[in-house]
Every structure is written in C-alpha cells, then in structure tokens.
Amino acid sequence: MVFKKTQPSPSLKNPERIQSFKKLSKKIGIKFSKIEYYNTAFIHSSYKNENPEILEDNERLEFLGDSVLGLVAARSLFQKYPKASEGELSRIKSKIVSTPILNSIAEKLNLGEYLLLGKGEKNSQGKGRRKIAANLFESLVGAIYLDRGFEVAEKFIVQHLLEFAENPDMEESVRDYKTQLQEYSQKHFKTLPVYRMKGESGPDHSKTFQVSVRIRDQWEASGYGASKKIAEQNAAKELYIRIRRGF
C-alpha cells in the first residue's frame, strides 16, 4: 500500500487537504457533513507524536469503528446463516473482519493516499503496514458513523466488506461437520462417533488442541484447532470426508 508523504499540517484550512476529502467523499459515495471527523480519521498516532500542535489522532475513531464493524458483521451473518451455531458464526465473523481483508479493502479504496503518517512509521513493512491500513478502514467507519449515522455506516460496510461472506471458503466455515458425521454414523453404523482429547500445545494465550474421533474400530481421524470445539469440528470434517470417499 502506498501512503501519502507527510504534509506540514493537517489543518482543514489547507485547500489541498479539503480537496482530498472531496475526492474521497465522491469515491465512496457518501456526502461528508463534518469533514473534521474524516480529517481525524486519517491522522496516525505517529504523526501526532511528531507534531505537538496536533491534538487528536485516529485511535478513538478506530475503536468506535471496530465496534460498529463488529455489530454490522454479526447482524448480517446472523440473518444470512439462520441455522449456524454461535461458534460457527464467530469463526466466519473473525475471518471477514480480519486484518488481511480490511487491508484489502483499504488497498482497493486507496485510503493510504489520505493518511498523515509519521516519518518513522512510513518505513514499516509487512504486517505493520497491513495493520495500519486495516486500522484506517476502521477509523473511517467510525467517522462515517459519527457524521452520518448507523444506517449510512452499515450500508458502507455491507457494500465493501460483506462481499467476502459470499466467498466459498466462508460458506465452508459454517458447515457443521459434527452434526453431519453424527447423522451419517447413526444411519450407516448404528452408533455415535466418540471424541477424545489427544493433547494440547503452545502457550496459554495461544493453545492448539488435538482431538481424535472414532466410529467403532473401523474409522478414525484427528483434528486441530484453537479450541476443543474447533478441533472437534476439524476432526469430524476429516473423518466425514474420508468415510464418504470410502477410505
């Protein structure tokens, strides 16, 4: 992502700065009533730290935008997948509001063009650069919410974010393989699958669990995940697919 070079001042008295927001307003199809919200949304904390006259950066708007984003995503997925469990909805939500996807949207909208970034931070690469872009999308959502209200912010989010929910990989995330395996096992083997914890690894804040699932002594598979439930789902998926393929 290409970020705009640091300007001497983010003052809205700067004609170039005002013109840039008119350009952004036209690009995203939202009329800005209070440009100061958007000005703040595009001031990174590193720029504020290097310019004492700047009173506020975009971190508070980022916090607000993250909450609005989460609500819109949760409500939309709740309506889209009426049979999905809480765990399944959480998994797909975490994917569509993840840093890589938010970064992709920021890239698509070229939000870095409007960002005031400190000299030191401009040299960041890789994950640091992607995180800045993702946070920028959240701060823009926060500004839209304050300026135009929830409905406009929701429309903007749905337009640019929830298209990712239509991705086949997302559809796959909400398939309940435990239920499918259980129903198949009862019908064809007259018994229920048996799950067992095989182990866990990693630090307390980032554990990986291993679970095995067996049907009689005939079929067995293992799965891994950040929680026991996810590991069970992955094990069930592995065994279900294996059984259906006949090996």
From Swiss-Prot:
CDD domains with a match to the protein in the record: DSRM_RNAse_III_family (cd10845), RIBOc (cd00593)
A GO CC term attached to the entry: cytoplasm
Keywords carried by this UniProt record: Cytoplasm, Endonuclease, Hydrolase, Magnesium, Metal-binding, mRNA processing, Nuclease, RNA-binding, rRNA processing, rRNA-binding, tRNA processing
Active-site annotation: 66, 138
Domain of life from the UniProt record: Bacteria
Keyword match tRNA processing: yes
Location(s) in or outside the cell: Cytoplasm
Reaction catalysed by this enzyme: Endonucleolytic cleavage to 5'-phosphomonoester
Enzyme Commission identifier(s): 3.1.26.3
Residues that, per the record, bind Mg(2+): 62, 135, 138
Domain DRBM: from-to ranges: 176-245
GO molecular function: double-stranded RNA binding; metal ion binding; ribonuclease III activity; rRNA binding
SMART domains: DSRM, RIBOc
Cofactor(s) needed by this chain: Mg(2+)
Domain RNase III: 21-149
Biological process, per Gene Ontology: mRNA processing; regulation of gene expression; rRNA processing; tRNA processing
Purpose of the protein: Digests double-stranded RNA. Involved in the processing of primary rRNA transcript to yield the immediate precursors to the large and small rRNAs (23S and 16S). Processes some mRNAs, and tRNAs when they are encoded in the rRNA operon. Processes pre-crRNA and tracrRNA of type II CRISPR loci if present in the organism.
Oligomer status and interactors: Homodimer.
Name assigned to this protein: Ribonuclease 3
Species this chain originates from: Leptospira borgpetersenii serovar Hardjo-bovis (strain JB197)
